[in-house]
Regions:
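Short glycine-/aliphatic-rich beta-strand segments at the starts of folded cytosolic domains
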Residues: 4-14
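Conserved short beta-strand edge segments in small beta-sheet-based binding/regulatory domains
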Residues: 70-82
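Short cationic amphipathic helices and targeting signals
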Residues: 10-12, 46-51
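Short amphipathic alpha-helix segments
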Residues: 18-29
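Short, low-order "capping/linker" segments at domain edges
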Residues: 86-98
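A common structural junction motif
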Residues: 31-32, 65-73
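Helix N-cap motif at beta-to-alpha junctions
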Residues: 51-57
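A short linear hydrophobic-aromatic micro-motif
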Residues: 33-38, 76-77
Length: 98
């Protein structure tokens, strides 16, 4: 799903795919958010990105971070309440088709 900066953006970064998938599952179940994309950095780091209203994204990121840490290594999490539109060009490299 293409991101244009119109909603809050939430990110959870992990070491490896297993905690990333666990985070994505919990993030999407925890709140009314949409999966934007994922990003692999090298062969180790995976970042999952979701969008939605600020409260939903905060809840989603918290649930994803807890889930990732329970099965692997969480390296970062962040909620950007209203990022500038140009951020969409960066985070939509591997956008997920709806």
């Amino acid at each position: 799903m293409r991101y244009y900066g119109e909603e809050a953006l939430g990110l959870v970064e992990t070491v490896g795919m297993v905690p990333a998938l666990e985070a994505a599952d919990k993030m999407l179940k925890a709140a009314d958010v949409e999966l934007v994309s994922y990003e692999n950095v090298g062969s180790t780091l995976v970042t999952i990105m979701v969008k939605g209203d600020v409260a939903a994204v905060r809840s989603s990121v918290e649930a994803g971070a807890v889930a990732a840490a329970a099965v692997g290594k969480l390296t970062a999490r962040n909620v950007m309440p209203r990022p500038i539109g140009g951020v969409g060009d960066i985070v939509s490299v591997h956008d997920i088709d709806a």
